[in-house]
Amino acid sequence: MRPLFSHIKKFFCLSLSLLICSACIDEIRLDIDADQAKVAIDGFISDSLRVHSIALSYSSVFGVGNDNIQPPISGANVGIRDGAGNFFSFEESSEEPGVYERLMAGEVGQSYQLEINLPDGREIRSRAIEMPRNNELMGIEYEQIERTFINTAGNVSTTIELILKIDSELDAQKRPFFRWRVGGQYEFHENYPMALSTKWCYISETLDFNQLELLDAREIEGNELRNKRIFSMPLDSRFAWQYCFHIRQFSMSEEEYIYWSNIQEILNTGGSLFDPPPGTVKGNLFNPADENDQILGFFSVASVSYKRYFANPDILNRFVDPKCSAIPFRPQFPECRDCSTVLGSELEKPDYWLP
C-alpha cells in the first residue's frame, strides 16, 4: 500500500496502481509553468515493518498546461527524523523516479518529522507528529440489502447491496481518530463457447476510489466501536467464485483527521477529487525559509490494523451468476477468453486464498 497522501494524490492521477510504460518512449514536453507549479508530497510512516515511501512531484495548476500531469522530482535528499534525533535516510527508487524508499517501522509514542532538501536548494519540513497507539480491528461482518428500482426499460429490477461493518477496540485514555481503506481481490474463471483451455485469474482492484470514511472516536461511549459501516458495493459477478476484502484501519492524529475532513467536505459538495478544489486544503508541510511557498500534501504518521474478509456464495448463502458462460446466446466479454488482460490481474493464486 502506498502512503496515505497517495490516497489523495492518486485520486487525482491514477486508480488502482501506476502503469509504467517500457520500451521506446518519445520525449514528452510538459506544458507546465514552473513559476506556478507547486511541490506535492506523498508521505506516510506507520508502526508496521514494511517499505515506506515518500513521493515527490510538481503538481500542475488546474487550467494551466496539461492538467493533472505531475512530473516527479528526482535527486532530492529525503529522510525522517524522530523525536530522539535519529535520522532515517530514504533512497530514490531505481524503478520509480521521485519515489524515495526505506524499510522501517515507526514506534508508537515517538514523534516523526519529514525533512526534504530539493535539488533547487529549497528545504521542506513537516510538523512533528506523534505515532498514535494502534487500535485493533477486531471483527468484520456483512449485511445484504435488496434494493428495488425501475430500470431504463421501465421494468422493475432488484439489486443486492453488500455492506461491510467493523468492530474495533478504542483507547480509553486517548480517543483515536480513524480512517478506513478498503481494497478488493476476486477470483475470475474464463469460460466461453467451445472453450478448450481456460485460466483462473486473481484480480485486485481499488474499491474506495473517491470515497473517505472517517470517524472522531471522541463521540463514542465505551471502549469498543460496534457495527461501524465502512463500505458498501453491489453484489455482482465478482462474487461468483470468491472475493477477498483487504481492510485497513488507520489511527491518526487530530491534525490529519481535520485535513481529511476538509477533503471530505469537497467530495460531499458533489465534487470529485479530479475536479479543481474550490480552495487549497492546507496540510502539515512547509518551507521554513519562505512561508509563502505553498507545499501540497500531508505527511502522515499513523498506526495500522489490518484484516482480510472473504465472501463467496457459500458464505453469502446466495447463488451469484458468473460473468463468463459457455452458452452461445449469453453475452460474451473479451476477458472471458483472456483474463490476464484485466488491470490488476495475476495468474498465481494468493497463498492466503481460501480453498
Predicted regions and their residues:
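C-terminal motif of bacterial Sec signal peptides marking the signal peptidase cleavage site
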Residues: I20-A23
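N-terminal hydrophobic targeting signals that begin at the initiator methionine
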Residues: M1-R2, I25
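Bacterial N-terminal signal peptides that target proteins for export
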Residues: R2-F12
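A sequence/structural signal for flexible, mid-protein segments enriched
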Residues: I25-P355
